[in-house]
A protein has these predicted regions:
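Conserved ABC transporter NBD signature motif
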Residues: 57-72
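Conserved ABC ATPase signature
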Residues: 125-132
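Helix-to-loop junction immediately C-terminal to a conserved catalytic motif
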Residues: 49
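The feature captures the beta-strand-to-loop junction immediately N-terminal to the Walker
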Residues: 34-36
Length: 132
């Protein structure tokens, strides 16, 4: 299942923010988007996430068009620009709340991934006390 971005363009207040962008994102791969400040990175991600409509072009996932066959991409999780957690909760509590959105991640999986990244899932330390 690939994600196809085909010839999308977007203007805001007469200024072209996205200009004829096309790309195929292959399933199972990780991508990064980089560019200068104001180059349209966030706008592109917002378009892919279905948060905005584009002026031209289309976005398709699994041969279904965004905003035509579906409102948002299925199973999409996106944090665009500001990453934040609930500072008054522990790391495990934060991840547990996020996992409850779809209900597809078990407590055991949260424990395993926290241990993998060197975090103690049983710690009561609040995330605002974590070092970055």
């Amino acid at each position: 299942m690939n994600l196809y971005v085909k010839s999308i363009s977007k203007s805001i207040k007469g200024e072209k923010v996205l200009d004829d962008i096309s790309y195929t994102f292959e399933s199972g791969k990780i991508y990064g988007i980089y560019g200068k400040n104001g180059s349209g990175k966030t706008m592109l991600l917002r378009a892919i996430a279905g948060f905005i409509n584009t002026d031209k072009g289309y976005i398709k996932y699994n041969h279904k068009a965004l905003h035509k066959d579906m409102d948002v991409l299925p199973d999409l999780g996106a944090v665009i620009e500001n990453i934040s957690f609930w500072s008054m909760y522990s790391g495990f509590e934060n991840l547990k709340m996020l996992s409850n959105i779809k209900g597809i991640v078990s407590d055991e999986e949260i424990y395993e991934i926290m241990i993998y990244f060197g975090l103690d899932p049983k710690s009561k330390k609040k995330v605002n006390k974590y070092s970055l």
